[in-house]
């Protein structure tokens, strides 16, 4: 099965797993047009996986349902996704095109955000980005921490397939927070080179994120010290670190 990413809008990725017969599992199709362009060449959409209700992730679903009647649309338990045909939550499994997709509840960016992972890939939506995480629109720092801990416990060899190309901008903040991290410096240089060549910085291994992403490293001494210095006081616990780090990122200007 082949992994591919379609670009949409300014920086979205629509991830797809395509089998040898041209059938696809499509993740977060905010825009139907790039998927339909492949459908005109023979692609068949078997299933759609949705991580959360934001329109840049679900906006293309009605057009895909019109093109592929009966297509499965698998989404979180969320009334703001009326196109869903199946709703799933923490610990459930979805079988599609012979692959098993495990469902994780990862609230923070939204209250009902989920992620899907196979034995090879993590489709994280807007919960986890390379070198960053999603802004807290509906969740709490405590929920965000729990979600990051859950994602941080996944196998290191999984490939992170997140929904936005934010790596270069996230790297600037991450290096500001963790300037002595040599692995982070290397990741930034690689990402800059990729973008100069108009290449995607994704997917990336979770192992790399474990080494470089400050939101997966709130328990470490460098991140705690940096957040404490930014706040002008000692942090209380990991929730305090996460809250301070997320608020810092929200207002950060390079």
UniProtKB/Swiss-Prot annotation:
Which residues hold Zn(2+) 1? 52, 54, 109, 126
Molecular function per GO: hydroxyacylglutathione hydrolase activity; metal ion binding
Is rRNA-binding tagged as a keyword?
Answer: no
Q: Return one Gene Ontology term, BP aspect.
A: methylglyoxal catabolic process to D-lactate via S-lactoyl-glutathione
User: What EC designation does it have?
Assistant: 3.1.2.6
For this UniProt record, the keywords arranged alphabetically read as follows:
Hydrolase, Metal-binding, Zinc
Task: Identify the pathway.
Answer: Secondary metabolite metabolism; methylglyoxal degradation; (R)-lactate from methylglyoxal: step 2/2
Q: What does the UniProt cofactor note say?
A: Binds 2 Zn(2+) ions per subunit.
Q: Which Gene3D superfamilies match?
A: Ribonuclease Z/Hydroxyacylglutathione hydrolase-like
Pfam families from the entry? HAGH_C, Lactamase_B
Q: Which cofactor does it need?
A: Zn(2+)
Q: Which reaction does it catalyse?
A: an S-(2-hydroxyacyl)glutathione + H2O = a 2-hydroxy carboxylate + glutathione + H(+)
Where Zn(2+) 2 binds, per the record, is at 56-57, 126, 164
Assembly information from the UniProt record: Monomer.
Family, per entry: Belongs to the metallo-beta-lactamase superfamily. Glyoxalase II family.
Q: Which NCBIfam families match?
A: GSH_gloB
This chain's function reads: Thiolesterase that catalyzes the hydrolysis of S-D-lactoyl-glutathione to form glutathione and D-lactic acid.
What is the name of this protein? Hydroxyacylglutathione hydrolase
Q: Which organism is it from?
A: Stenotrophomonas maltophilia (strain R551-3)
- The record's gene field reads gloB
């Amino acid at each position: 099965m082949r992994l591919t990413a379609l670009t949409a809008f300014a920086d979205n990725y629509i991830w797809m797993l395509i089998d040898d017969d041209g059938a696809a599992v499509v993740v977060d199709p905010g825009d139907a047009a790039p998927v339909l362009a492949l459908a005109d060449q023979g692609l068949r959409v078997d299933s759609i996986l949705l991580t959360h209700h934001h329109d840049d992730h679900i906006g293309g679903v009605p057009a895909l349902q019109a093109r592929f009647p009966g297509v499965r649309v698998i989404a979180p338990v969320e009334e703001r996704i009326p196109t869903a045909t199946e709703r799933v939550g923490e610990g459930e499994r979805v079988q599609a095109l012979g692959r098993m997709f495990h469902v994780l509840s990862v609230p923070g960016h939204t209250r009902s955000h989920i992620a899907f992972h196979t034995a090879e890939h993590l489709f994280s939506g807007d919960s986890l980005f390379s070198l960053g995480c999603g802004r807290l629109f509906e969740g709490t720092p405590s929920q965000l921490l729990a979600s990051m801990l859950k994602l941080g416990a996944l196998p290191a060899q999984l490939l992170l397939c997140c929904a936005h190309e934010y790596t270069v901008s996230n790297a600037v903040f991450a290096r500001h927070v963790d300037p002595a991290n040599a692995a982070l410096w290397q990741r930034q240089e690689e990402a800059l080179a990729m973008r100069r060549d108009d290449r995607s910085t994704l997917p990336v291994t979770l192992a790399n994120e474990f080494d470089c992403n400050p939101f997966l490293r709130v328990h470490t001494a460098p991140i705690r010290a940096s957040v404490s210095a930014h706040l002008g006081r000692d942090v209380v616990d990991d929730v305090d670190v996460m809250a301070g780090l997320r608020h810092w990122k929200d207002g950060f200007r390079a």
